[in-house]
Amino acid sequence: MKNSIFKCFGITKADVTSILSDIFANSEGVLITLQEEGPIVSIKIDADDSNNRVMDKTAEIFQRLNNYIYAEEDISIYEAVFRLMKLNHLTLATAESITAGNVSACFVKYNAGASQILLEGNVVYTNNAKMRMLDVPEKVLNTHTAVSVETTYDMAKGCLNKSGADIVIATTGYAG
């Protein structure tokens, strides 16, 4: 059996289905399956007999979805980002509220040698932690709330200034 896989981010399964509807309709001899896990859509292409069929469908799918494809193998987005950052000698720090450290934890979980890129992870769940650890101004928190673009920006800026990382990820949001 010949097969191929694409891992996509930033697009829903419904949108992938719509974009590829004509490919699904004309895929005799080729099995194309979609699986959505959170923000990730996996596209698997299998054929019993012809490598050309898989290659043709793979090329068509890649052409249409290349802005969303982060890997052509079965890896997590954390692994793909880690590889790119390592290749480009970039470092990362996180400022996490809603995710409570999960982003940095996933980089460590999925990547042996994560310390090559991950400098630090800050969990700043309370307003006090945001002010104390990341220098988020109290005025910004009071005026715009902890769950705002302005606060997230100041979290990222504070993390960038304090960590010296090349790239910072900041998260905030409503827990429920």
Language-model region placement:
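Accessory alpha-helical/coil subdomains and C-terminal extensions
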Residues: 1-39
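Short loop/turn motifs enriched for small/polar and acidic residues
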Residues: 37, 46, 172-174
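Short, solvent-exposed polar/charged micro-motifs at secondary-structure junctions
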Residues: 15-16, 42-45, 103-105
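Short, conserved charged micro-motifs
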Residues: 14-17, 49-57
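Conserved beta-strand core positions
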Residues: 30, 41-43, 167
